A protein has these predicted regions:
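Conserved nucleotide-diphosphate donor binding/catalytic pocket of glycan-assembly enzymes
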Residues: 1-16
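Single conserved hydrophobic/aromatic residue that forms the stacking wall/gate
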Residues: 188-196
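Conserved catalytic-core segment of nucleotide-activated headgroup transferases in glycan assembly
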Residues: 16-104
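A donor-sugar binding/catalytic signature common to diverse glycosyltransferases
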Residues: 109-155
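Short, conserved active-site loop motifs that form the nucleotide-linked donor/cofactor pocket
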Residues: 10, 100-101, 168
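Hydrophobic/aromatic ligand-binding patch that stacks against planar heteroaromatic rings
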Residues: 65, 136, 160
Length: 196
């Protein structure tokens, strides 16, 4: 529908618009959550998007997710002190324990892909989706939860999920996004309890 807004000729590729390097390898050595300040017994939501993509609206949804999933934390890329302060202040105002938000420092791409394997579910941002960060998560074996917008920037993760056959993790709206996050967390934790 947005094609009329582009002066360039659009070339449609099968499955997804994004071309990725299939030769990138991820270290297969065992990784410990404690090395990254992560708890062993919690569901780990993550978002490694640049902080400007974390809008008040999407952060409010993440707060609701944390409230509905008591055995979870969220792991967010830390870009600067101001963004950390703002995210922590909102968490505090929402009466959620400080230890449920863990900041990740910037690492080399190779080391980042390695640590990403520790996350259980990547939470996408909206209206500007994850692009390379969503690809990185999927490449590391971490499913991405997104919801489909109307613009190119708000449909990137939808495109990537479709190419991976993860259509069930494309929500139609904010409520379904919240419900899916809670359901995935609950299902994962129940499976862990059963296998213990």
């Amino acid at each position: 529908d947005s094609e009329r807004f582009y002066s360039e000729k659009i070339i449609y590729m099968p499955d997804t618009y994004q071309v990725n390097d299939p030769t990138i390898k991820i270290d297969s050595q065992k990784i410990k959550k404690e090395n990254y300040g992560l708890p062993d017994n919690k569901f780990i939501f993550c978002s490694f998007n640049q902080n400007y993509k974390i809008t008040p609206s999407i952060y409010n949804i993440w707060i609701k997710i944390l409230k509905e999933t008591k055995d979870s934390i969220i792991w967010i890329l830390s870009e600067n002190n101001k963004s950390r302060e703002n995210l922590l202040e909102k968490l505090n105002l929402s009466q959620i324990d400080r230890d449920r938000l863990i900041f990740a420092e910037k690492l080399s791409h190779k080391d980042h892909l390695y640590r990403l394997k520790l996350a259980d579910l990547f939470l996408d941002t909206f209206p500007c989706n994850a692009h390379t960060t969503a690809s990185d998560a999927l490449r590391s074996g971490v499913p991405v939860l997104t919801y489909k917008g109307k613009t190119f920037a708000s449909r990137v993760a939808t495109s990537l999920n479709y190419s991976f056959g993860l259509n069930a993790l494309v929500a139609k709206d904010e409520k379904e996004y919240l419900d899916l996050a809670v359901a995935v967390s609950y299902t994962h934790l129940r499976a862990h309890e059963t296998n213990s």
